[in-house]
């Protein structure tokens, strides 16, 4: 295998994830390797979740989260669920604490194999999201796409869930909007110095919503867990929905759903949903060269 490490191709509601086992190594998955893997039809991904040895006492691992353009991401809820499922299959453990670029994540796998991830507390301060302009009320900011007198999208709620999010409210199915056209413009808007994830959210009842997301550094994606968290929090914050909602991810296979709860007692956001193992292989973290396992692998494990 040479310089190769084990990896598993997984998905969270269709969000394509490569879970890479970098434990016992001092190097990391390089940007050029990520770009090469993203450019291959079989290994194309939305995020790489690279599992490293822990840097902090009391944590199981440090997780590097890498976008398909080679940049680092602070959070990936769907990817975290995949990591938990893989490590649970390997170790038999059900509860994990991880360190990421954004901080500490706690997660647990349930008996039905769904995974709950404590995504931490949302950040609403404009300079910590961050925004390039001062807004005292980030539940509704001045930003729109389209004519001034008839904007297609306008007045998003903005926040950070470890990464910047803008949630635009829409009155029909999010799939009916041309997010492929608007997404890149909004992701790279000067208002977002670190770029932003762009989500269209339709509130369908006090406890249900539908979303679609253009993901920072990944583009149009089938699902984005942190975006679902941002949408759920924003809906509760603006009085559109309760603090506990089921969010249908419109672009996911069979329109799958995530349960999002913005806990009142501590302000943390809990995301619960499924993850799915697809296949396993080995890859070179420097170049992105890879090979698929010839024999049937052990499901959902990367070791």
From Swiss-Prot:
Annotated catalysed reactions: (2S,6S)-2,6-diaminopimelate = meso-2,6-diaminopimelate
Record-level Gene Ontology MF annotations: diaminopimelate epimerase activity
Pathway(s) per entry: Amino-acid biosynthesis; L-lysine biosynthesis via DAP pathway; DL-2,6-diaminopimelate from LL-2,6-diaminopimelate: step 1/1
Alphabetical GO biological process terms: lysine biosynthetic process via diaminopimelate
Top EC category: isomerase
Summary of subunit composition and partner proteins: Homodimer.
Protein name: Diaminopimelate epimerase
């Amino acid at each position: 295998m040479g310089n190769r490490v084990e990896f598993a191709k997984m998905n969270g509601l269709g969000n394509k994830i490569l879970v890479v086992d970098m434990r016992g190594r001092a190097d990391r998955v390089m940007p050029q390797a990520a770009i090469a893997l993203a450019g291959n039809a079989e290994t194309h991904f939305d995020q790489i979740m690279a599992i490293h040895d822990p840097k902090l006492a009391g944590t199981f691992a440090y997780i590097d989260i890498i976008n398909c353009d080679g940049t680092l991401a602070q959070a990936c809820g769907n990817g975290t669920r995949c990591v938990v499922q893989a490590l649970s299959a390997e170790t038999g453990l059900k509860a994990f604490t991880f360190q990421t670029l954004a901080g500490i994540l706690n997660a647990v796998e349930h008996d039905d194999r769904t995974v709950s991830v404590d995504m931490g507390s949302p950040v609403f301060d404009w300079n910590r999201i961050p925004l390039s302009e001062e807004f005292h009320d980030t539940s509704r900011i001045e930003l729109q796409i389209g004519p001034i007198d008839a904007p297609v999208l306008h007045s998003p709620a903005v926040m950070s869930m470890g990464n910047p999010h803008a949630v635009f409210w829409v009155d029909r199915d999010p799939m009916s909007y041309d997010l492929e056209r608007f997404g890149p413009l909004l992701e790279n808007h000067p208002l977002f110095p670190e770029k932003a994830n762009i989500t269209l959210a339709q509130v369908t009842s006090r406890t249900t919503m539908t979303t679609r997301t253009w993901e920072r550094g990944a583009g149009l994606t089938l699902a984005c867990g942190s975006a679902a968290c941002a949408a759920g929090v924003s809906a509760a914050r603006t009085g559109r929905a309760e603090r506990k909602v089921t969010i249908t991810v419109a672009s996911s296979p069979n329109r799958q759903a995530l349960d999002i709860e913005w806990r009142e007692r501590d302000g943390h956001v809990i995301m619960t949903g499924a993850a799915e193992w697809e296949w396993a292989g080995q890859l070179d973290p420097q170049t992105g060269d890879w090979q698929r396992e010839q024999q049937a692998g052990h499901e959902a494990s990367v070791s």
